[in-house]
Amino acid sequence: MRIIGMRFCCFLLVLIFRVSFVSSEQPRASDPSQIPAIPQPPITFQPDPSGAVPQAQFRELLRYAQDREVENEKRLRDYTYVEREEEHKLDGSGNVKKTETRTREVLQVYGEEVERLIAKDDKPLSDAESKKEEEKIQKVINKYKNESESSRRKRLEKEEKERQEERKFVLEIADAFNFRLVGSETLDGRETWVIEGEPRAGYEPKERSTKILSKFKGRVWIDKTEGQWVRLDITAIDSISVGWFLARIHKGMHIEAEQTKINDEVWLPKHVAVRVDARLALLKSYNEDVDETFRDYKKFRTESKITAVGETQ
């Protein structure tokens, strides 16, 4: 989660149904060969006598997709990429009144994801702005280059605790919804199952954070061969208050997400589109369309360490 407000709402929705961009991961192996090979999924739906697919089979498939995301998260740390965010600010009638774009290069610095702004409104930064971004990255590099062992241990323990909390949230997704097989569809040349999910009546959340699951419905497209999610379509079916009314997400908020296979080894984000309709601290309204694209994935050596901006060893 990068900043509060509108981005918080986007992050929250992505977390709920993407099964999941931010699901649990274990500490990264220093050698990609140490990451276990992904087994082929046993995706063979067996309808019951009435012709319906039992819920247990859907949940097995979705949990399998969640496990694949653990591997995706590990491998993502071996990549840099470019993210372009386009924000359309809307008036009360839904018409665009202002458009802004930000393009960022996303780097991995001592295991931390760090963003460097490289363009605004599709125009390169000025020399002064570029220098400021370079100084920001160098500050992060210096911080972790000189990090003590005890500080590093505390940082990793904190990150692991956060991952475990995220994992608890994600694990409830398969239990909190009733699923229906809509059919099959070809996306980017790949055959997918199309599965629809709606809140399960009477479900009792195990975690306080998962109470909001009943406020959403959606569809997920899952690759038949690899069990990876390919596309998501999520809608808020009720208004949601977040964090002691610090934010309120309105009914009808909508998000679409896509991911794609990179280097024949990992599935990573391709596109996210969000219709934001929310109010922050009961005062400031956010009525925006946000469109994010992810490109130029480049793999770097896992043993490399960035010791200065533009340098590795």
Q: PLM features: what roles do these ranges have?
A:
Residues 9-20:
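Bacterial N-terminal signal peptides
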Residues 2-3, 15, 34-37:
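Generic short N-terminal amphipathic or hydrophobic helices
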Residues 26-217, 224-230, 235-253, 258-270, ...:
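Structured extracytoplasmic
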